[in-house]
């Protein structure tokens, strides 16, 4: 099936282009199309969408393959599940609140609440906060810790024995990926600061960036062109029409829209210089062999990757082309990634409505951006990648 491709002209003075150009030459749109098709054949992935950002602007948008079992084509405006790329979008919104003086990254969350966190009744929109009634360490948690995955929580309470929420380590003392931590920050913003996170995301992120087909909850107008998914064994899974705003991962989007978000993150559009620096600054070292399981033992210092660290809503790293950041998104039938390099303000964003596409991510990102040193084995563990 012939892939769709959009290309945007990038106009800038020749002197500026020479000054900012990274060493790797970006491949042409037809070359990217061909590489996508090759890797889809290698992985058996049924659908794949990709965007390229250059100089902080959207340069290419591609979509190839199918959006559903009926064989309807995946298009640049097809609704796809963003999964945990939502976390990066949420962090972008939170930093705008910081810029507006509505939130302090280092003020404990207890200062924003009108009662102790465990005194709030259980609510299916959030986590079971009453489970923390015998552990006062929750009072140490700050928004910065939550955005950099240092809350002390597991990924989600429902994964715990008996489904009980608990702190596994003193907040702020190590990295452990936690969707529940992002949900806690959402709770603080809604119950403590008095904001509607869904509305703030719409106003501060989607409307600001022209992301017209992106939402934190399902919209009826998405139904005409949405992507179902394929699991690792090749079975299909229908698109989930999510009805609740979840900072950890409820966002639906398109490759065209998510490209605009990546461009804003890498260029700093919408953020003060100070907040943009915080987004991609190494907040805390990552000390485990892989992202999952989230509470695995830390590696001995000599075996840790020294440049790998938590940013705010993203993971940061250093490689042959300098400083970069990335965020992944995963579900049983979804594989997504966003990789950005500070030098040249370049990104590749990939949305796959087939989880098998993840095996192609290192090759595809390398083809577009060159060698980046993205920590693929930390992100995906022992997954076998195609060359």
Across the structure, where does each feature detected by a protein language model lie?
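Short, surface-exposed loop or secondary-structure junction motifs
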Residues: 68, 120-325
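Boundary at the C-terminal end of the N-terminal hydrophobic targeting segment
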Residues: 16-20, 25
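Short, conserved catalytic-motif segment at the N-terminal edge
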Residues: 25-81, 102-104, 124-126, 159-168, ...
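Short, well-ordered beta-strand elements
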Residues: 60, 324-327, 335-354
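Short, gly/Ser/Thr-rich active-site loops of penicillin-recognizing serine hydrolases
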Residues: 282-299, 354-387
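Acidic helix-start/capping segments at beta-turn-to-alpha-helix junctions
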Residues: 53-55, 106-121, 127-129, 282
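Bacterial N-terminal signal peptides
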Residues: 5-16
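Active-site SXXK
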Residues: 33, 50, 56, 79-109, ...
């Amino acid at each position: 099936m012939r892939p769709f491709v959009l290309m945007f002209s990038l106009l800038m003075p020749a002197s500026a282009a020479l000054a900012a150009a990274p060493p790797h030459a970006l491949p042409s749109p037809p070359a990217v199309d061909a590489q996508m098709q090759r890797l889809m054949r290698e992985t058996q992935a049924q659908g794949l969408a990709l965007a390229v950002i250059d100089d902080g602007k959207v340069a290419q948008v591609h979509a190839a393959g199918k959006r559903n079992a009926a064989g309807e084509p995946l298009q640049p405006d097809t609704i796809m599940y963003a999964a945990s790329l939502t976390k990066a979008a949420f962090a972008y919104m939170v930093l705008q609140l910081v810029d507006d003086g509505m939130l302090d990254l280092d003020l404990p969350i207890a200062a924003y609440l009108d009662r102790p966190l465990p005194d709030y009744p259980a609510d299916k929109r959030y986590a079971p906060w009453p489970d923390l009634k015998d552990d006062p360490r929750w009072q140490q948690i700050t928004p910065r810790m939550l955005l950099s995955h240092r809350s002390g929580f597991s990924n989600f309470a429902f994964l715990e024995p008996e489904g009980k929420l608990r702190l596994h380590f003193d907040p702020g003392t190590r990295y452990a990926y936690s969707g529940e931590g992002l949900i806690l920050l959402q709770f603080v913003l809604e119950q403590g600061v008095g904001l509607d996170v869904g509305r703030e995301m719409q106003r501060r992120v989607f409307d600001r960036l022209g992301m017209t087909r992106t939402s934190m909850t399902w919209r009826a107008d998405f139904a005409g062109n949405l992507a179902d998914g394929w699991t690792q064994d090749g079975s299909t899974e229908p698109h989930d029409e999510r009805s609740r705003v979840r900072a950890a991962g409820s966002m639906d989007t398109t490759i065209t829209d998510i490209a605009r978000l990546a461009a804003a993150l890498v260029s700093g559009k919408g953020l003060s210089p100070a907040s943009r620096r915080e987004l991609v600054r190494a907040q805390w070292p990552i000390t485990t062999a892989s992202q999952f399981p989230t509470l695995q033992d830390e590696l001995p210092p000599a075996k840790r990757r020294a440049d790998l660290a938590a940013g705010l809503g993203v993971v940061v790293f250093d490689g042959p082309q300098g400083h970069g950041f990335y965020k992944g998104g995963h579900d049983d039938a979804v594989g997504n990634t966003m990789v950005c390099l500070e030098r040249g303000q370049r990104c590749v964003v990939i949305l796959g409505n087939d989880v098998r596409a993840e095996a192609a991510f290192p090759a595809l990102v390398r083809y577009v951006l060159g060698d980046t040193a993205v920590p693929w084995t930390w992100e995906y563990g022992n997954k076998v990648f195609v060359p």
